[in-house]
């Protein structure tokens, strides 16, 4: 919904979100702006959400559920921009090689389906 209003958060780490009764409240909004890079928001969230797990099935589930949810109201072109940019590469230092490859492969595969 935020992206549909042409806003980006700029700092979409899961730790900057509070979940309560099926609603999400965002904190740490000093990087929020209008008409920013939505692909950055998507990439940052996916990478940080995957960072702390070594259970690769859970990582796959997190990524796929996020993409499913995003596509309910978001624009699939934003996912294509993520695939066609170097955004995911920025997060390589904080991820294992396997985690990075899982993220990259899932996002690329999901984009090809559109």
PLM segments and residue spans:
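Conserved protein kinase catalytic/activation segment
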Residues: 16-26
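C-lobe/activation-segment region of protein kinase-like
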Residues: 29-113
